[in-house]
């Protein structure tokens, strides 16, 4: 049987971008309600606040009762607009960094982790302005029909705070940390463990093998990177005192949260984050791999 002709860079890149974008779109549509709940937990500061959520179940009940079903989809437009290019960048840059690192004397295990770190830092640059808008909309507790539109809220931020690190790009260093650390662990764990556990000939068991490794990858990465996520939400969300900026930089915000609220405050929203990015991480990897394989065969 004759070998397939070599695939040009443009075709290969197009497949990676399309598969990555598809993975992001599917994941955000399935998992966004948990992202809303996670953000709400991260920006609440004390349990004595009458609006604070007592538990995961309580948050779902309160949001549904006071804001309706669409309350769970607040802020979904920015991630939908961002997820396709964001995940496309995530997977495309991971593959490209991995290829570049092939010229360096790194072990395969370390190559996956370093390529993941590079892809996360690149992804953060693309996504941060969308994250600022998303967090602001998710923090709004009015009914879905009463909150500002995505574009009007973005214009409000630009007009009031500008485009810089105090405005549409605030929380940039925290976003770099969040995405860099997550992708480093996520890709590093997934591909290293997948290479260790033997491939199963049964398609169903092989699917479950990949899903299980992806689930663990997303879960472990979430546990490790959540302090950056909490810092990002505090910086990008509403400040405790209107007109006074309390949370400014990533590590100073972490230190402030730790000093005032304790170490566990840096892990606020961990359960909904794991519930979202555990299975969501598995979904992304599987959608990417199966879509990429389909594109290789059909395009």
Swiss-Prot record:
One of its GO terms (cellular component) is mitochondrial inner membrane. Keywords: Antiport, Lipid transport, Membrane, Mitochondrion, Mitochondrion inner membrane, Repeat, Transmembrane, Transmembrane helix, Transport. Its main location: mitochondrion. It is a multi-pass membrane protein. One of its GO terms (biological process) is lipid transport. Solcar repeats lie at residues 11-100, 107-196, 205-294. The chain crosses the membrane at residues 17-37, 62-82, 100-120, 179-199, 211-231, 274-290. The keyword Membrane applies. It catalyses: 2-oxoadipate(in) + 2-oxoglutarate(out) = 2-oxoadipate(out) + 2-oxoglutarate(in); hexanedioate(in) + 2-oxoglutarate(out) = hexanedioate(out) + 2-oxoglutarate(in); L-2-aminoadipate(in) + 2-oxoglutarate(out) = L-2-aminoadipate(out) + 2-oxoglutarate(in); glutarate(in) + 2-oxoglutarate(out) = glutarate(out) + 2-oxoglutarate(in). One of its GO terms (molecular function) is antiporter activity. It comes from the Eukaryota. InterPro entries: Mit_carrier, Mito_2-oxodicarb_carrier, Mitochondrial_sb/sol_carrier, Mt_carrier_dom_sf. SUPFAM superfamilies: Mitochondrial carrier (SSF103506). It is found in: Mitochondrion inner membrane. Transports dicarboxylates across the inner membranes of mitochondria by a counter-exchange mechanism. Can transport 2-oxoadipate (2-oxohexanedioate), 2-oxoglutarate, adipate (hexanedioate), glutarate, and to a lesser extent, pimelate (heptanedioate), 2-oxopimelate (2-oxoheptanedioate), 2-aminoadipate (2-aminohexanedioate), oxaloacetate, and citrate. Belongs to the mitochondrial carrier (TC 2.A.29) family. This is Mitochondrial 2-oxodicarboxylate carrier. It comes from Bos taurus.
């Amino acid at each position: 049987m004759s070998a397939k002709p070599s695939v040009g860079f443009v075709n290969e890149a197009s497949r990676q971008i399309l598969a990555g974008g598809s993975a992001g779109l599917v994941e955000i549509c399935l998992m966004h309600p948990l992202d809303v709940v996670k953000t709400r937990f991260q920006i609440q500061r004390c349990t004595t606040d009458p609006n604070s959520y007592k538990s995961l179940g309580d948050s779902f009940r309160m949001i549904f009762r006071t804001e309706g079903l669409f309350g769970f989809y607040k802020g979904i437009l920015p991630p939908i607009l961002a997820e396709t290019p964001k995940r496309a960048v995530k997977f495309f840059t991971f593959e490209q960094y991995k290829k570049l690192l092939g010229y360096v004397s790194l072990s395969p295990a370390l190559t996956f982790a370093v390529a993941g770190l590079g892809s996360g830092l690149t992804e953060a640059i693309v996504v941060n302005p969308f994250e600022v808008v998303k967090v602001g909309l998710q923090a709004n507790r009015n009914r879905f029909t009463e909150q500002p539109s995505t574009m009007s809220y973005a214009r409000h931020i630009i007009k009031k705070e500008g485009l810089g690190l105090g405005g549409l790009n605030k929380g940039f260093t925290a976003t770099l940390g969040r995405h860099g650390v997550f992708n480093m662990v996520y890709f590093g764990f997934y591909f290293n463990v997948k290479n260790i556990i033997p491939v199963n000939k049964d398609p169903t068991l092989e699917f479950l093998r990949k899903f299980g490794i992806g689930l663990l990858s997303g879960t472990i990465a979430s546990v490790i990177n959540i302090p950056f996520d909490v810092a990002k939400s505090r910086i990008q969300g509403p400040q405790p005192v209107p007109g006074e900026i309390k949370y400014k930089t990533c590590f100073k915000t972490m230190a402030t949260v730790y000093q005032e609220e304790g170490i566990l405050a840096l892990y606020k929203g961990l359960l909904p984050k794991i519930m979202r990015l555990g299975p969501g991480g598995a979904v992304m990897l599987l959608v990417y791999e199966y879509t990429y394989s389909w594109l290789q065969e059909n395009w």
